[in-house]
């Protein structure tokens, strides 16, 4: 009987220990940097959807700050409205604010994570993900200046939508948002 109680106690102890470890791991927060209306987080690539989870990431990335700034400057969008104009996704003062932080994030991101960013602007938030594969740096946008991506010209509420305008050497692909 004494041996039965000992083994029963050991079994309960092991189950409690495993449960505590699992709860501790599940509660681990993503690494987050927040400064002056700009937030960066490293997120597991599997949480970003099936289109990204299939991509072989090449992280951390060896890239200079001037290169990141050129990328940011080259990103252009167009509002899908009657008088929609091509506009930069990031204004020069925004690039000045976030260029160094994005560079450091790309240089330090773990190989199985992607970078999620959110920039608060007077016109609304610009948010999305950035990650690198073998040949490309991928910029994925959820919203630009407060306008969320809906995949069609007008949203059900009549809000104007947008599309990316690829520049020389760029291409874009619209992926359905989950």
Place the predicted regions along the sequence by residue.
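Bacterial N-terminal signal peptides that target proteins for export
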Residues: 2-12
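Bacterial N-terminal signal peptides
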Residues: 11-20
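C-terminal motif of bacterial Sec signal peptides marking the signal peptidase cleavage site
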Residues: 22-24
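Bacterial signal peptide processing site
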Residues: 26-29
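Post-signal peptide N-terminal segment of mature Sec-exported envelope proteins
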Residues: 31-60
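Compositionally biased P/S/T/G-rich terminal and signal peptide-adjacent segments
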Residues: 55-73
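Mature extracellular/secreted ectodomains of secretory-pathway proteins
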Residues: 67-178
């Amino acid at each position: 009987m004494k041996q039965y109680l000992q083994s029963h106690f050991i079994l309960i102890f092991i189950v409690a220990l495993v449960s505590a470890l699992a709860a501790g791991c599940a509660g681990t927060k993503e690494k987050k940097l927040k400064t002056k209306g700009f937030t960066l987080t490293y997120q597991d690539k599997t949480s970003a959807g099936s289109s990204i989870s299939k991509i072989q990431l090449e992280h951390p990335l060896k890239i200079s700050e001037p290169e990141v700034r050129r990328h940011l400057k080259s990103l252009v969008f167009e509002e899908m409205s009657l008088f929609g104009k091509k506009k930069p996704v990031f204004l020069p003062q925004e690039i000045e604010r976030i260029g160094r932080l994005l560079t450091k994030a790309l240089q330090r991101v773990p190989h199985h994570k992607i970078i999620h960013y959110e920039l608060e602007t007077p016109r609304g938030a610009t948010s999305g993900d950035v990650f690198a594969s073998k040949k490309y740096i991928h910029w994925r946008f959820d919203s630009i200046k407060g306008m969320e991506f809906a995949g069609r010209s007008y949203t059900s509420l009549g809000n104007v939508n947008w599309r990316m305008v690829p520049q020389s050497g760029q291409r874009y692909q619209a992926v359905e948002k989950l």
